[in-house]
């Protein structure tokens, strides 16, 4: 039955207005309902106190208000980072992370259940892709975390489970809802979307001319090493991926971030650092060096701190911004 109900949390204002009118209500009700969903973040129709009980029943008969169920919260003793496990209405579970900074609260959300990209160092892809998340399921991760901590979320990164550009249309609707001034109203400049390098989608996103930051999971300085770490590189050459990043900057004026997980003995040599700086030479970019997270299903290990320092120093010497 749920499949036949309309997912109104995924609707923009125009669609919601059309839907409410089709149910026999007046246009102004749509604005009230949109506010209940996207400003007050209610979890049920019954919480909409200025809507008549009669029309609430009509809504229940025709629509569903997607609401994630908080299954578990793990809090880091080191820095207070909170990892959330949310249950979806089909029984699948997704992860989100809250990071608290001096400049505000940042949430990292998932865009899919599982992932089909197969990156060798990533645990999220071990069981493949189950499905893409709806816009409502993406944005409700932010709403639920905001309610849990009782504070405003100011920054969002789409870097959790899944390849965001593999769920492209839902991602765009999520961005529209997230940045709507009638909703939670998070600035496009405070949103980062990651990709493993789906070149046609990167170029398509560039043409949307949004003010969001694009983060490319690069993780290697040449094509052969990237193919060994990331199966997506069999479809897209590393130079085509970097060219797509240059195109993104040309279209949007937004500096691209390169994510580079340092894997001990695999991609962390001085030669790798030299190749990396040559690869992105002349670009207005940011390089984020990340010691890889070991997972039991793979035998990759972190680079030691001395090796990381060498990579960082080399990139700085070549006027490429590295971040540790």
Model-derived features: positions:
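Flexible, acidic/Gly-rich N-terminal and inter-domain linker regions that tether
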Residues: 1-105
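Alpha-helix N-cap recognition
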Residues: 41-44, 222, 320
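Canonical Radical SAM [4Fe-4S] cluster-binding loop centered on the CxxxCxxC motif
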Residues: 100-137
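Conserved alpha-helical substructure of the radical SAM core
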Residues: 125-155
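Conserved AdoMet/S-adenosylmethionine-binding subsite of the radical SAM
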Residues: 146-155, 160-311
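Conserved small/polar residues in nucleotide/adenosyl-binding loops
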Residues: 313-320
